[in-house]
């Protein structure tokens, strides 16, 4: 039986790659829905991007629901300098997808899919956690029916402020609510995602895969590589969000440690900081599993295999 997942995302180059890996022909994952949230770009642009990516994948069977257009409390903030004005700059995509998002809001879709599933559902969250927190606030009972939340966000250092990673910083109040939910949470932060850089050698490898999906990924990675060289002086783009799906596909690729995680949501200086108690100094019980290392070579092998299934 396939593992049932809901992908809550803000596509986003790395979100797009995560979608492609999850929806591959031989995937052991069943995508119940894709829900979008404001983050890398506006929720309208992110929704268009999700629909376009699913079109490229040939997965028009997967419903897309538009979610929160701003965080729980503070104004919206976008990452245009990283993902471009469209949120998926680089590839040429249609301005109007082949279909529209469903009418039901994302948080309602999350609640509905979780509560009506005959097996527990995994939430894969690769953007700000606004939709997930909203669903938990509106229907707390979903926590009992969620197998895990596997998310990209946070880390022991920052990329948007000196101490905060973008996804958590956008809506720290939502993140705090999620980490206090009691649900099993698998965290893929900058500590591990910065180990998986798609450099020129990786891009050349994927260029040899002769199908439209693989070539779309190449265009995504080329844009991301340039962006990360310009803004962070890195030799490749980290495939941040894809790590969530890679873990669900092949968990042995990652070293995970149980830790207590808390989210700072009050300090103007450190808002959005993820406090990861790696050394167990607080004495608080673990509420998450935190990725610390990854088998990079096997990551590229797995992605190569998944891209070839689209031939």
Regions found by a protein language model. Give the residues of each.
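Conformational coupling and interaction surfaces
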Residues: 2, 18-30, 169, 188-311
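Metal-dependent C-N hydrolase catalytic cores
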Residues: 3, 47-116, 286-296, 304, ...
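Glycine-centered flexibility motif
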Residues: 39, 67-70, 84-87, 153-154, ...
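A residue-level signal for conserved active-site and pocket-lining positions in enzyme catalytic cores
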Residues: 64, 178, 245
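Generic secondary-structure boundary/loop-capping signal
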Residues: 69, 79, 85, 129, ...
């Amino acid at each position: 039986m396939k593992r049932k997942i809901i992908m809550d995302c803000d596509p986003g180059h790395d979100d797009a790659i995560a979608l492609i890996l999850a929806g591959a022909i031989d995937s052991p994952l069943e995508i119940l829905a894709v829900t979008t949230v404001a983050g890398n770009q506006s929720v309208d642009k992110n929704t268009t991007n999700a629909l376009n990516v699913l079109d490229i994948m040939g997965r028009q069977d997967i419903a897309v629901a538009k979610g929160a257009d701003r965080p729980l409390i503070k104004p919206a903030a976008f990452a245009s300098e990283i993902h471009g004005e469209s949120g998926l700059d680089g590839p040429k995509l249609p301005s109007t997808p082949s279909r529209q998002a469903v009418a039901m809001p994302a948080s309602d879709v999350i609640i509905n899919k979780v509560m009506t599933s005959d097996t527990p559902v995994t939430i894969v969250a690769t953007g700000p956690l606004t939709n997930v927190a909203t669903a938990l606030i509106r229907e707390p009972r979903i926590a009992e029916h969620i197998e895990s939340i596997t998310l990209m966000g946070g880390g022991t250092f920052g990329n948007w402020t000196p101490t905060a990673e973008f996804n958590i910083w956008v809506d720290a109040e939502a993140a705090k609510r999620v980490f206090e939910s009691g649900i099993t949470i698998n965290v893929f932060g900058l500590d591990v995602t910065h180990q998986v850089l798609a450099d020129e050698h990786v891009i050349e490898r994927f260029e040899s895969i002769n199908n439209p999906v693989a070539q779309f990924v190449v265009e995504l990675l080329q844009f991301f590589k340039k962006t990360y060289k310009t803004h962070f002086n890195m030799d490749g783009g980290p495939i941040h969000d894809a790590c969530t799906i890679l873990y669900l596909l092949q968990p042995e690729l990652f070293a995970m440690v149980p830790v207590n995680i808390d989210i700072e949501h009050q300090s103007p200086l450190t808002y959005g900081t993820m406090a990861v108690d790696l050394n167990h100094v607080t004495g608080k019980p673990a509420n998450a599993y935190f990725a610390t290392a990854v088998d990079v070579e096997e990551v590229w092998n797995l992605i190569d295999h998944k891209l070839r299934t689209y031939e």
